[in-house]
Amino acid sequence: MAVASRVDAALTAVPRERFLPPGQRRHRRRDAPLPIGHGQTNSQPTTVRQMLELLDVQPGDRVLDVGSGSGWTTVLLAWLTGAQGSVVGVERVPDLVAFGSANVRAAGMPWAHVREALPGRFGAPSQAPFERILVSAQAPELPLDLVSQLAPGGVLVVPVAGRMLRVTASTDDTGGPAVEEHGWYRFVPLVADPPDEPQVD
């Protein structure tokens, strides 16, 4: 099946409304970001479709979903990987970790889960490498911490300074990643909470 067809099938199988707060569900068909609390949003469906097409998730892939929010993209990614793959959603807002986790559990895909982001770190370095990384928040520059979590030949899709980038890791240690630009987009900012302060007796 072509990439676009697989993504459309995922979007049909995983309805957006199940990942929206009750007050936003009447807007489920609106092609716009919708608020989910704490200044965060459930992304615009056409943007999600385009990002998933660029990511080109394959069955069995290990996938990282940065800024997982409501859990919608986490479950879409899990549909694309199938049960032979795995998806880790990372979210920094505790209330959204709980909201997204509940939504992922309700979807019945145990190979996907949401965890709270580590202070001062992007992604899930202890669970790397990943074949695919999706970032649903805008970085001011290419987040090398996330590039380093890619498997050889892995793909990162991330908005950077308004541009959507598709970053492909080198298949060996002889070169840096290949970076392609794919249009202009607007997202909430990518943020890492400060590292925990060391305890002083």
What does each model-identified segment do?
Residues 1-66, 72-80, 95-106, 175, ...:
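Class I SAM-dependent transferase core
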Residues 38-40, 83, 196-199:
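Short, charged/polar low-complexity linear motifs in solvent-exposed/disordered segments
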Residues 56-170, 178:
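Conserved nucleotide-cofactor-binding alpha/beta core module
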Residues 159-201:
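Active-site capping/gating segments
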